[in-house]
């Protein structure tokens, strides 16, 4: 069991159970999965950029990333159906907890002028999406060796039914929300 999962079971579950008056600890919202996505519009013309992004996302996540391909052709973007346009990886269970721990405690504090994560990334059902402008904030990435800084979307999918439940869950886990 990972450090963050221990914190969830021992500290977060009782707090949420008391706050929302749940009868059972099984009703308490939990985290289902974390999805990481890098969208590369220029990758359709530059194959080297795609390979680099795949390697870097695999290193950050600790799990092999897959290429996402265009579903439709769009002439104005010079895009054909089936062309690579990005890469993604979905983390569950132990890798998910390890990644969240790394994100909250190491990566986010390394962001320049970091004042907290804005809480407007909730979708109305308790899931949270966060955009990162530079993937070099992760400890596995050596900032001086990164040629093309890439942004990424991180989506945390929870079993929470409302944004209030989801925000309290992530807040108790240590997500540094903006005050």
From Swiss-Prot:
This is one of the proteins that bind and probably mediate the attachment of the 5S RNA into the large ribosomal subunit, where it forms part of the central protuberance. In the 70S ribosome it contacts protein S13 of the 30S subunit (bridge B1b), connecting the 2 subunits; this bridge is implicated in subunit movement. Contacts the P site tRNA; the 5S rRNA and some of its associated proteins might help stabilize positioning of ribosome-bound tRNAs. One of its GO terms (cellular component) is ribonucleoprotein complex. Part of the 50S ribosomal subunit; part of the 5S rRNA/L5/L18/L25 subcomplex. Contacts the 5S rRNA and the P site tRNA. Forms a bridge to the 30S subunit in the 70S ribosome. This is Large ribosomal subunit protein uL5. It comes from Nitratidesulfovibrio vulgaris (strain ATCC 29579 / DSM 644 / CCUG 34227 / NCIMB 8303 / VKM B-1760 / Hildenborough). Disulfide bonds: none annotated. One of its GO terms (molecular function) is structural constituent of ribosome. The keyword Iron does not apply. InterPro entries: Ribosomal_uL5, Ribosomal_uL5_bac-type, Ribosomal_uL5_C, Ribosomal_uL5_CS, Ribosomal_uL5_dom_sf, Ribosomal_uL5_N. Belongs to the universal ribosomal protein uL5 family. One of its GO terms (biological process) is translation. HAMAP family: Ribosomal_uL5_B. PROSITE patterns: RIBOSOMAL_L5. Keywords: Ribonucleoprotein, Ribosomal protein, RNA-binding, rRNA-binding, tRNA-binding. The lineage of its organism: Bacteria, Pseudomonadati, Thermodesulfobacteriota, Desulfovibrionia, Desulfovibrionales. PANTHER family: 60S RIBOSOMAL PROTEIN L11-RELATED.
């Amino acid at each position: 069991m990972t450090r963050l999962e221990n914190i969830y079971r021992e500290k977060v579950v009782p707090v949420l159970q008391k706050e929302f008056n749940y009868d059972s600890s099984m009703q308490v919202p939990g985290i289902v999965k974390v999805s990481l996505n890098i969208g590369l519009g220029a990758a359709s013309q530059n194959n080297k950029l795609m390979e680099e992004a795949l390697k870097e996302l695999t290193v950050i996540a600790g799990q092999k990333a897959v290429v996402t391909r265009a579903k439709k052709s769009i002439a104005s973007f010079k895009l054909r159906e089936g062309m690579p346009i990005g890469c993604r990886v979905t983390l569950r269970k132990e890798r998910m907890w390890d990644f969240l721990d790394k994100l909250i405690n190491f990566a986010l504090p390394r962001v320049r002028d970091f004042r907290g994560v804005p809480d407007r990334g909730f979708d109305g059902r308790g899931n949270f999406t966060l955009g990162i402008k530079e993937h070099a904030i992760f400890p596995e990435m050596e900032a001086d060796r990164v040629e093309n800084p890439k942004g990424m979307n991180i989506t945390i999918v929870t079993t929470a039914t409302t944004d209030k439940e989801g925000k309290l869950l992530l807040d108790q886990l240590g997500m540094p929300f903006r005050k």
